[in-house]
From Swiss-Prot:
Molecular function in Gene Ontology: glycine binding; glycine dehydrogenase (decarboxylating) activity; pyridoxal phosphate binding
GO CC terms in record: cytosol; glycine cleavage complex
Annotated GO biological process: glycine decarboxylation via glycine cleavage system
Assembly and oligomerization: The glycine cleavage system is composed of four proteins: P, T, L and H. In this organism, the P 'protein' is a heterodimer of two subunits.
Cross-referenced Gene3D superfamilies: 6.20.440.10, Aspartate Aminotransferase, domain 1, Type I PLP-dependent aspartate aminotransferase-like (Major domain)
One Pfam assignment: GDC-P
UniProt xrefs under CDD domains: GDC-P (cd00613)
Protein name (database record): Probable glycine dehydrogenase (decarboxylating) subunit 2
InterPro entries attached to this UniProt entry: GcvPB (IPR023012), GDC-P_C (IPR049316), GDC-P_N (IPR049315), GDC_P (IPR020581), PyrdxlP-dep_Trfase (IPR015424), PyrdxlP-dep_Trfase_major (IPR015421), PyrdxlP-dep_Trfase_small (IPR015422)
Keyword presence, Oxidoreductase: yes
Keyword set, alphabetical order: Oxidoreductase, Pyridoxal phosphate
Segments passing through the bilayer: none
């Protein structure tokens, strides 16, 4: 039942004082002024509290259980991060600069830490999410080539067929032509394929390393050399940075632009649309094009530098999602250098433990040592049982587990992409393995049981097609 359906005429939670001020003409055009009162629910405070408490109890989150969503890094978010963020909630970005020096210092220290982790020279913290960071990075690349007088010819962005869908979308939004690179049989970039497409018309090569198959791009130094020899830039999608912290750095691999997901790698909560944070780091030759303001060290303090004539301009109001930065800063300070390295080591160990165990039951697309995630290929399983990857995912819900990412990456048919993260214990991983084995046996012995799952969730299977074609965004009587 929606909150609107619980509405009772005349019921109130609070009564506001009489409005005694004179009416003011706000200059709103007459045709835009509401003619009728908004349709708002009339409910008491206890109705509201019970309604949303009930909804919360039906929700699933990493605080409730295992969340192996591939390429999403759904790690546990320490609650100390929230405590620290609360300390800054009384600040306002329009305060005089001298009164927010603590916040500016925090952003400055965070920027330096992230530059050190990624091997970049400068950074903006403004972008609000990963895809926003991608677009910002590509706009920086565009400004760079425009400044060099090469934008007219450099119109192409090369993107592997295993890439996140946001990569080609961001490139197109930035005004580039997207060229797809077919992966090699080993799941990595095919150097011959790259060589065939790489010329002086290429502006950027976008890569994720490890890639979305959970495999490290072993030829990354060669790829970087090939890109730079023709004057192209190498862009790093930071979605999978959780696998390599303290072991290697994108900047050392030859990447010119690096975007991060603070809401993934650095344990700030994400999902359901936000809040996120997608900073981008760059090498020195791209620093003049970063969004303003850039945080600079000024003596013993940090300051905001707006004096960048070649900047692409602001990409986000004020300074970005600041409290998300506070949480990431807290996480980095808590973990330290050794802790972050251990995070990546455990993420890789957990993924390989699951891969080794599940490969005895399911077919792993690339069954060799992986990084932080791996992909199951269920194509033969579907032919054998009639049970699809989606059915397995739905059945997992009955076992109290969140499903992995399904049907991505697109180059693996009936894909199931599993990323356990570093925060899960062996006991939890074994529970997941046990559930996956039971579902496998159910699919063979009683496929209809799996096809009709889930059975224990508040809502069973949604009509995805109609929900996509005819979405309902607001309540109507």
């Amino acid at each position: 039942m929606t909150i609107f359906e619980k509405s009772t005429s005349g019921r109130k939670g609070y009564e506001l004082p009489e409005y005694e001020l004179p009416s003011v003409d706000c200059g709103i055009p007459e045709h835009l002024v509401r003619k009728e009162k908004p349709l708002l629910p009339e409910v008491s405070e206890v109705d509201v509290v019970r309604h949303y408490t009930e909804l919360a109890s039906k929700n699933y989150s990493v605080d409730k259980g295992f969340y192996p969503l591939g390429s999403c890094t759904m790690k546990y978010n320490p609650k100390i991060n929230e405590d620290m963020a609360m300390l800054f909630t009384q600040l306002h970005p329009m305060q005089p600069r001298e009164t927010i020096q603590g916040a500016i210092d925090l952003m400055g220290h965070l920027k330096e830490m992230l530059c050190e982790i990624t091997g970049t020279d400068d950074m903006t913290l403004q972008p609000a999410a990963g895809a926003h960071g991608e677009l910002t990075g590509l706009l920086v690349a565009r400004a760079y080539f425009e400044d060099k007088g090469e934008l007219d010819k450099r119109r192409k962005v090369l993107v592997p067929d295993s890439a996140h869908g946001t990569n080609p979308a961001s490139a197109a939004m930035a005004g580039f032509e997207v060229v797809e690179l077919k992966s090699g049989k080993d799941g990595c970039v095919n150097l011959e394929e790259l060589k065939a497409h790489l010329d002086e018309n290429v502006a950027v090569i976008m890569l994720t390393n490890p890639n979305t198959l959970g495999l490290f791009e072993k030829d990354i130094l060669t790829i970087a050399k090939m890109a730079h020899e023709v004057g192209a830039l190498l862009y790093y999608d930071g979605a999978n940075l959780n696998a390599i912290m303290g072991r290697t750095r994108p900047g050392d691999m030859g990447f010119d632009i690096v975007h991060l997901n603070l809401h993934k790698t650095f344990s700030t909560p994400h999902g359901m649309g936000g809040p996120g944070s997608g900073p981008i780091g760059v090498k020195k030759h791209l620093a003049p094009y970063l969004p303003v303001p850039v945080i600079r060290k000024a003596g013993e303090k940090y300051d905001l530098d707006y004096n960048l004539p070649k900047s692409i301009g602001m990409v986000r109001s004020f300074y970005g999602n600041f409290t998300v930065m506070v949480k990431a800063y807290t996480y980095i300070l808590t973990m330290g250098n050794k802790g972050l390295k251990h995070v990546s080591d455990m993420a890789v160990l957990n993924a390989n433990y699951l891969r080794a165990k599940l490969s005895k039951i399911y077919k792993v697309a690339y069954d060799r040592i992986c990084m932080h995630e791996f992909v199951i290929d269920n194509e033969e399983f579907v032919k054998k049982t009639g049970v699809k990857t989606l059915d397995i995912a739905k059945r997992l819900l009955d076992y109290g587990l969140h499903a992995p990412t399904v049907y991505f990456p697109l180059i693996v048919h009936e894909a199931m992409m599993i990323e356990p993260t570093e925060t899960e214990s062996k006991r939890t991983l074994d529970e997941f393995i046990d559930a996956m084995e039971k579902i496998y046996n159910e699919a063979i012995e009683n496929p209809e049981l799996v096809k009709k799952a889930p059975y224990k969730t508040p809502i069973r299977r949604l009509d995805d097609v109609n929900a996509t074609k005819y979405p309902v965004f607001r309540y109507k009587k």
